[in-house]
From Swiss-Prot:
Protein name: Large ribosomal subunit protein mL46
Listed SUPFAM superfamilies: Nudix
A molecular function GO annotation: structural constituent of ribosome
Keywords assigned: Acetylation, Mitochondrion, Ribonucleoprotein, Ribosomal protein, Transit peptide
Highest taxon listed in the record's lineage: Eukaryota
InterPro entries: NUDIX_hydrolase-like_dom_sf, NUDIX_hydrolase_dom, Ribosomal_mL46, Ribosomal_mL46_N, Ribosomal_mL46_NUDIX
Family statement drawn from the similarity comment of this UniProt entry: Belongs to the mitochondrion-specific ribosomal protein mL46 family.
Originating species: Pongo abelii (Sumatran orangutan)
Covalent S-S links between cysteines: none
PTM annotation (N6-acetyllysine): residues: 230
GO CC, one annotated term: mitochondrial large ribosomal subunit
The keyword Transit peptide is assigned to this record: yes
Subcellular locations according to the entry: Mitochondrion
Length: 279
């Protein structure tokens, strides 16, 4: 009995020694790999913080036929199960007083109160008849003016700007190069600050980037220490402000997710579409 137990213990001990040797080897290999990695200060890639500035929908989308039927059903259930409002209770009391009037059981002093409830309903009816719904299709929609924020009111709009890279004009999300000592979100906030001449305010959604894009510089600009750039995107919702139409005509657009393909390069567009939603 003692011999099998001893062999088992020796086997366990031998396995543990082999595990320790493998573990030590893997740690030393990992240390060598980290030591061989270039430092961040000497990286040939430049870091950029980009701003994905969105204007949320200003109106709700039109209901589909199914949604209209569902809304009607829920409204009917609400009417059947809800309690009387204060005005409805007052109207019931008014009906009782009118019934008493017919039986000559009412007091003339109560007539003012009886008429007041009806007057309120008449005033509300007139207000309702005078109310006009705003147009969903704006003048900017009719002219296809994509520099205006007053378009596609039921869709998310994204800001694109036109920048010059070499001898080409390229549409991109607004971006700024990272500076030592600041966070990438700080870089994106500084990007927004470059548009501050238009008094634009926005709410950033988190501290982590929502996406990234890597590109190499043109061959004429590329060197061993300057291969390209890595762009990190940060989402923000527009609160107030807009571009000055006079100073930026033709240099920016507000577009929907479906319209991005008219401006962005295919590879850049693929990365941007990954973190954009249009609910």
């Amino acid at each position: 009995m003692a011999a099998p137990v001893r062999r088992t213990l020796l086997g366990v001990a031998g396995g543990w020694r082999r595990f320790e040797r493998l573990r030590a080897g893997s740690l030393s290999s990992r240390s060598l790999a980290l030591a061989a990695a270039p430092s961040s200060n000497g990286s040939p890639w430049r870091l950029l913080g980009a701003l994905c500035l969105q204007r949320p929908p200003a109106v709700s989308k039109p209901l589909t036929p199914f949604q209209e039927e569902m809304a009607s059903l829920l409204q009917q259930i609400e009417i059947e199960r809800s309690l009387y409002s204060d005005h409805e209770l007052r109207a019931l009391d008014e009906n009782q007083r009118l019934a008493g009037k017919k039986a000559d059981l009412y007091d003339e002093e109560d007539e003012e109160d009886i008429l007041l409830a009806q007057d309120l309903e008449d005033m509300w009816e007139q207000t309702f008849l005078q109310f006009k719904l705003g147009a969903r299709i704006t003048e900017a929609d009719e002219k296809n003016d994509r520099t205006s924020l007053n378009r596609k009111l039921d869709r998310n709009l994204v800001l694109l700007v036109r920048e010059k890279f070499g001898d080409q004009d390229v549409w991109i999300l607004p971006q700024t190069e990272w500076q030592p000592g600041e966070t990438l979100r700080g870089t994106a906030e500084r990007t927004l600050a470059t548009l501050s001449e238009n008094n634009m305010e926005a709410k950033f959604l988190g501290n982590a980037p929502c996406g990234h894009y890597t590109f190499k510089f043109p061959q004429a600009m590329r060197t061993e220490s300057n291969l390209g750039a890595k762009v990190f995107f940060f989402k923000a919702l527009l609160l107030t402000g807009d571009f000055s139409q006079a100073g930026n005509k033709g240099h920016h657009v507000w577009v929907t997710k479906d319209e991005l393909g008219d401006y962005l390069k295919p590879k850049y567009l693929a990365q941007v579409r990954r973190f954009l939603s249009d609910l």
